[in-house]
Amino acid sequence: MKVTDVRLRKIQTDGRMKALVSITLDDAFVVHDLRVIEGNSGLFVAMPSKRTPDGEFRDIAHPINSDMRQEIQDAVMKVYDETDEVIPDKNAQPSSDSEDNGSEEEA
């Protein structure tokens, strides 16, 4: 499985979320609401998540091996580094159940 397209919107914010991302896998499957987060060790890609009734955040979709996680990270960060346009954060909202949960879950 390969990342065949990355759509990224950098956002201007005081928070740790720096971009919203959608990826396409094998030109056949799209995953929305990935986020580029500024963590303690630098930027990383967070998977789409949903708040559970007890207030925890759970990934909706995520890679199940480190090779796929690294491929996603590399593809997203390449586009992030090449993107100059930044939009105001009020126009860059993830879907209503996804949130910047600040997780530091790096691969």
Swiss-Prot record:
Biased composition (Acidic residues): 97-107
Pfam families: SpoVG
Chain positions covered by the region annotation Disordered: 82-107
UniProt keyword terms in alphabetical order: Cell cycle, Cell division, Septation
Source organism, top-level taxon: Bacteria
The keyword Cell division belongs to this UniProt entry's keyword annotation: yes
InterPro entries linked: SpoVG, SpoVG_sf
SUPFAM superfamilies: SpoVG-like (SSF160537)
Single Gene Ontology BP annotation: division septum assembly
UniProt function note: Could be involved in septation.
NCBIfam families attached to this UniProt entry: PRK13259.1 (NF009749)
Family membership: Belongs to the SpoVG family.
Protein name per the record: Putative septation protein SpoVG
Organism annotation: Staphylococcus carnosus (strain TM300)
